[in-house]
Structures are given as C-alpha cells and as structure tokens.
Amino acid sequence: MAHYFVGDVQGCFTELQKVLEKVDFNPSQDELWAVGDLVARGPDSLATLRFFKSLGDSAKTVLGNHDLHLMAIHGKLKRDKPSDNLKALLKADDINELIDWLRQQPLMRELPEQQLIMTHAGVPPQWSLETLRQESALVSHALKQDDYLEALISQMYTDTAERWEPTALGIARLRFCINALTRMRYLYVDGHLNFDCKQPPQDCTDPQLRPWYEYTSPLRQSHTLVFGHWAALMGNVNDKKLKALDTGCCWGEHLTLWHLEKDQKITQKRLKKS
C-alpha cells in the first residue's frame, strides 16, 4: 500500500485527478492523505468534496481554515464572497451530507509506525504529541455536537495575537487549537501567534517573528510533520522532516503530491484559472 499526501486542493479537482493519474492511484490499495483546504477559490469544490467522501477509508483528510469557513457560510454565520467560489457547492442537493462528512474530519492525523503527523498549518512548538492529540480531540468533539455552529464555529477565529495557555478553558482553549492548527505561520518570540505576515521567511522584515517550525520543539525532533496552508513557501523548508505541500495551485502555480514510501514529490501545473 502506498501513502500519498496532497497539498491544498482548494477546488482544483481536475489537477487533483491529473496528479493521481500520474501515480496510478488505486483506492482499493492506496491511501490519499490531504492537508486540508479541500474547498474554496478553485473552480470545483463540489466535485472535490464528493470525491474525497466517495473514497471512504482510503481518504484521510484534516480540516483547514477554508473548510471551517465553509461550515460558517453554510450555517449562515458568514457570507460567501465571489473569491470563495463556493456557490455551486452551497446549492448542491447533497450539501448537508458533505458538511456532515467534513464535521467528522479531525484537525490532526498521524501514522504512528512512521512517526508522522499531518495538520493543515503546523503544530505549536510548545506542544507534545499528547497535547496535540488531546487538544485536537476536544475540537473534534465540539464539531460533532448539534450546537457546533453556535458553540464553536461562531467563535472560532480571532485576529488578535493568542498564546498557548495550558490553563485556558472552554472556547478560549478550542479557539487557540483551531487558530494554531489551521492558520499559523509565524510566532512572536514570546509564543503569540501572528496572523498578518504571509510572506516567506526570507521576505519577513519583523525581527520578532519566526516561522513556527524554527522554534525548538520535541515533535520537530521526533516526527515528520506534513502541512499545507503556506503557499508562499512553495514547499521550500530545507528540512527532511518537514513536508510543506501547499504550492499554490489555486493561485495558478501547481498541486503537489508526496509519495511517503518513495519520499518523492509529484506535481501538476494549474491547467486553467477560474
């Protein structure tokens, strides 16, 4: 069995199919792991969600910020913008089933035998594996509740800098987990998250900011970390234990697939902007 990991698809369904054809992906034998952000901006979020749902246990995805944003739009907590490119998905007959399927997806997945962890944006350097498991499980539990829109989705984001507080309770604790695992790029030296800078490290001019993966972390030493979210990196992190897979397909660049067993990246150029 082969394990394939794909970067942010964001509705680029044709490119996804093309890159899977290049490796002869067989869902009866192989697994497709996705770093999240299956939807938004690209031309066919509906087909993308339907495809991943149809794969059953052969698909392993985590939630990204755009997937959570879709839940907010569907729940009428946010308005969809033209740039979201979600109208066909929101009008689909099976939208409720697709949203329910998304709600079952976690914020982190792991392959223990490979010492590999996958999240959308990264892992806070302060967290141990046990903390990561615990905090992501709390969010997953909240997403599966009937009141998930009011209790979680309506309060999940903040644009103020947040720092991990082990004693935090309730929504503050859940919110840090969501913001860290789905939106994080840079941290201040005191551990606060920064949401403003999206540039690659070589272009960041604030001396107080460092990429999350440059901080000392027990998980950085022991595990391979697979993530997406940060298209500006274009996969360039210069560390064999970091697999940055968002290579900006929805922005006109390309989609990246990583074959775990061969440690090989396969790419598909964006075919058509929409």
Curated annotation (Swiss-Prot):
It holds the Pfam family Metallophos. CDD domains: MPP_ApaH. It catalyses: P(1),P(4)-bis(5'-adenosyl) tetraphosphate + H2O = 2 ADP + 2 H(+). GO terms for molecular function: bis(5'-nucleosyl)-tetraphosphatase (symmetrical) activity; phosphatase activity. GO terms for biological process: RNA decapping. Its EC number is 3.6.1.41. GO terms for cellular component: cytoplasm. Keywords: Hydrolase. InterPro entries: Ap4A_hydrolase, ApaH, Calcineurin-like_PHP_ApaH, Metallo-depent_PP-like. Hydrolyzes diadenosine 5',5'''-P1,P4-tetraphosphate to yield ADP. Belongs to the Ap4A hydrolase family. This is Bis(5'-nucleosyl)-tetraphosphatase, symmetrical.
